[in-house]
Amino acid sequence: MAQTTTLILLLATLLVAATTVSGQGPHIPLAPSPSVNEAMNCAAGLAVCLPAITQRGPPSQECCTAVETALTTQLSCLCGFIKSPMLLIPFNVTDFNALFSKTCGLTTDPNLCSETAAQAPLPKTAAPVPGAPKSDKDAASKLAGTGLVGIVVITIAAMFY
């Protein structure tokens, strides 16, 4: 029962943090934001790693495969966990990247989610026109997408407990 409560608390914390971050004022994204489908796939894929995080045991092969997949196809989602270590502090995990790269045998660049690495693959765009900042017309859809992902993750977690 305590494990279920802890898991739901973790997922709720992740949802609140993600909603707060995506609801902040205009910003320049460092890495391309994942679409709702990509975020749902990433969160669902990494859900297999929760036992390794909560029980502090070695991750399963399924978890290692999910992290490896996220490294190659869903980097912006994985960087969200790597760049927000405060989300995992209740589980005494301070370095998400080190936890899985060491135990899964994955070799990752320590600067994988740094500003320069995250900006490198972005296509060149025209410089913004000086003047008043533009309003973020997609803010509501970002908040709705984040909330939807959170609800899906919490529902999936609740189904297994």
UniProtKB/Swiss-Prot annotation:
Residues 1-23 form the signal peptide. Its main location: membrane. It is a lipid-anchor; GPI-anchor. It comes from Arabidopsis thaliana. Disulfide bonds join 42-79, 49-63, 64-104, 77-113. Residues 139-161 form a propeptide. Glycans are attached at residue 92. It is found in: Cell membrane. GO terms for cellular component: plasma membrane; side of membrane. It comes from the Eukaryota. Probable lipid transfer protein. A lipid is attached at residue 138 (GPI-anchor amidated aspartate). SUPFAM superfamilies: Bifunctional inhibitor/lipid-transfer protein/seed storage 2S albumin (SSF47699). Pfam families: LTP_2. This is Non-specific lipid transfer protein GPI-anchored 24. The keyword Hydrolase does not apply. Belongs to the plant LTP family. Keywords: Cell membrane, Disulfide bond, Glycoprotein, GPI-anchor, Lipoprotein, Membrane, Signal.
